[in-house]
Regions:
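Rossmann-fold NAD(P) dinucleotide-binding segment
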Residues: 63, 76-97
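Residue-level detector of conserved catalytic or cofactor/ligand-binding positions
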Residues: 187-200
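Short glycine-cluster motifs
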Residues: 146-188
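Generic hydrophobic/aromatic pocket-lining and core-packing "Φ" positions
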Residues: 25, 57, 82-86, 162, ...
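General beta-strand structural signal in soluble alpha/beta enzymes
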Residues: 13, 37-40, 93-95, 118-123, ...
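NAD(P)-binding Rossmann-fold cofactor-contacting core
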Residues: 30-48, 179
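Rossmann-fold NAD(P)-binding glycine/threonine-rich loop
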Residues: 99-117
Length: 200
């Protein structure tokens, strides 16, 4: 059973008109994720690869009923992007950016908790529920649908573990890279729910 994301996930890509945001928005869409919109200040009303672009997260959530966001903005803007997403009503926020000042992450994390949302990252590869949805920069082709949960602070270690699991016919329900920075949103303890995953 997948956790956090599935076929009902409706995703907004913050920073969708940037190089990384656009590249990975296309990859997530190709995987089957419902990428319902993106944000880029000043570019609202346009679209990229058939994905509508909004000026703010408030507009994006109101128009698309999104419940998840992924952040591809420069580190100096990332904390504000996290808080904007939470304030707009997003329930799950994934921050890929690295190099965000620790105090900014602490402030953003506290704000997210106050809003009742969840933060994965920063400095993380995101998460995937194989065959259902991917929110991040993971190589979807190495994953196999199954019942093993994978949780790691390291993106490359996650891929290595999953490669060997898949090669041995052990599919994954959800794989999550929680991020390698000193301060991250969800921790191993938060995510480890043995009642929902047969193996972790």
């Amino acid at each position: 059973m997948s956790i956090l994301i599935d076929k009902s996930t409706r995703l907004i890509v913050q920073g969708i008109t940037g190089r990384d945001g656009l590249f990975h928005a296309k990859k997530m869409k190709e995987y089957g994720t419902h990428v319902v919109g993106g944000t880029s200040p000043g570019k609202g009303g346009t679209d990229v690869d058939g994905i509508p672009v909004f000026n703010t997260m408030y507009d994006a959530v109101e128009q698309t009923k999104a419940n998840t966001s992924i952040i591809f903005v420069p580190a100096r803007f990332a904390a504000d992007a996290i808080m904007e997403a939470a304030d707009a009503g997003i329930r799950l926020i994934v921050c890929i950016a690295e190099g965000i000042p620790t105090l900014d992450v602490i402030k953003a994390h506290q704000f997210v908790e106050q809003k009742g949302a969840m933060l994965i990252g920063p400095n993380c590869p995101g998460l995937i529920s194989p065959g259902k949805s991917m929110v991040g920069i993971l190589p979807g082709q190495v994953f196999l649908e199954g019942n093993v949960g994978v949780i790691s602070r390291s993106g490359t270690l996650t891929y290595e573990i999953v490669y060997h699991l898949t090669a041995n016919g052990m599919g994954q329900s959800t794989a999550i890279g929680i991020g390698g920075d000193p301060v991250v949103g969800l921790s191993l303890i938060h995510i480890s729910e043995p009642t929902r995953l047969r193996r972790i």
